[in-house]
Amino acid sequence: RSRGLGDVYKRQILGLHLEGHYLNMAMAGGQIPENIKSPDPNEYIPIVETWSCIKRWDAAPELPGAMQFGKYITAKGILASVAHTQAEFEDIRTAYEAGYTHATHFYNAMPGFHKRREYKYEGTVESIYLLDDMTVEVVADGIHVPPTILRLVYKIKGVERTCLITDALACAGSDSREAFDPRVIIEDGVCKLADHSALAGSVATMDRLIRTMVQKAEIPLADAVRMASETPAKIMGVYDRKGSLQKGKDADIIVMDEDLNVRAVWAMGKLVPETNTIS
């Protein structure tokens, strides 16, 4: 299906984002624990050399070999992002210097400010806030990150360093009550591990993110739209052709009504017929 969409709407599938599997086991979340490991150059170098479609790869920077991994993929033009991590401030600062300039699903699968016995410590979240130029993304469905925290991210990181993502599974946008993974259930408008130990992805579509940011987090519509278009395009290095309505760019246009429901979609200048509800 993805290949078919790519044939119809040229340049719409921009590349691959690999979220695993160089992650912290303690922050596995919906990842498969058996696959989690530390970065291994004997594994990732052949992958990068073989697959030029990889545009982004995540890792927990506190793992052995993570700094070497970050430097390597950054040199290859791949965005390095921190994810599923328990990194402390020095880990994050060193990681940023090694090329990790972005944070995957910020606030999820990473600790915030916490206490160990009688002492208090910054978490990964605060460490990322302290690096002004580090960009973040948030699952803005209102469940993965509550609206009050979405507004906090907006106030601290700002429009130009925050982008909105769905982190959605294949069941997003459907009426399905079952996920493709038997470990996962769909409940309360979100995917969860069946044992209720963690969230496991969303069922949100991008229009829902806009509605959440505007109607619940009380963020200006123009800024919410920029965080869903302009900012991610800049982070991924495709702003020359995506992310804004300008002459010469790809004509990707969404028309919404006053309640922010989708009324029509143009992809690469072509109207997607099944989306058109404009009379």
Please describe what each predicted stretch is.
Residues 1-9:
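Single conserved hydrophobic/aromatic residue that forms the stacking wall/gate
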Residues 10-31:
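Metal-cofactor-binding active-site regions of metalloenzymes
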Residues 24-50:
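Conserved phosphate-binding/catalytic loop of the ribokinase/pfkB sugar-kinase fold
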Residues 49-174:
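Active-site core of metal-dependent hydrolases
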Residues 120-138, 154-166, 171-256:
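His/Asp/Glu-enriched, well-ordered alpha-helical/loop segment
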Residues 260-266:
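Short, Lys/Arg- and Gly-enriched loop/turn segments at beta-strand edges
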